[in-house]
């Protein structure tokens, strides 16, 4: 399997871990508890700054290359392109709502929770669609030259949470992950 696809699969594993963590925070929020808003905001900042700026653009390059090779699953790739945009928008909206709560803005709890649940649901569907449909197709159809070209064009950045940690920027998230690493 191409190294780039290995990296994307690892990113998905890490993101799934964050989605589970976000879901636990939302479950507590639903029960009337105060979630760790700083933790939730850091998770969303990570998604905005790594997934939206590095991970998704890399996947988009793979999708474009696949479309040059074949029309097979074009509809799925078009859905994934749209989902990248929608996920970015939902993430930003949810983060703004959480920051509003932190700054004591008057927001309905149920609507804030609904934003979070919608983001989680779409993100999980998105990961399943990529891993179940498009990544196997990429393994099958893309050549070594395709992978080299994608690698050259892909944005480069070290994962600030699961790679070379930016402990100052993502302190709360990093500390939480280190405390729950074996879960």
Question: Where are the predicted features?
Answer:
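Small-residue-biased structural context
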Residues: 1-183
């Amino acid at each position: 399997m191409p190294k780039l696809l290995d990296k994307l699969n690892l990113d998905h594993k890490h993101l799934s871990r964050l989605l589970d963590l976000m879901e636990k925070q939302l479950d507590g929020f639903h029960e009337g508890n105060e979630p760790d808003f700083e933790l939730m905001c850091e998770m969303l900042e990570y998604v905005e700054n790594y997934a939206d700026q590095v991970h998704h653009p890399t996947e988009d390059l793979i999708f474009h290359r696949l479309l040059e090779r074949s029309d097979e699953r074009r509809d799925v790739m078009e859905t994934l392109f749209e989902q990248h945009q929608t996920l970015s928008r939902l993430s930003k909206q949810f983060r703004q709502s959480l920051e509003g709560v932190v700054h004591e803005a008057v927001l309905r709890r149920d609507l804030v929770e609904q934003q979070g649940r919608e983001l989680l649901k779409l993100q999980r569907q998105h990961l399943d669609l990529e891993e179940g449909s498009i990544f196997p197709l990429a393994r099958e159809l893309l050549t070594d030259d395709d992978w080299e070209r994608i690698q050259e064009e892909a944005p480069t950045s070290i994962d600030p949470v699961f790679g070379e940690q930016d402990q100052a920027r993502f302190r709360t998230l990093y500390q939480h992950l280190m405390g729950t690493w074996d879960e």
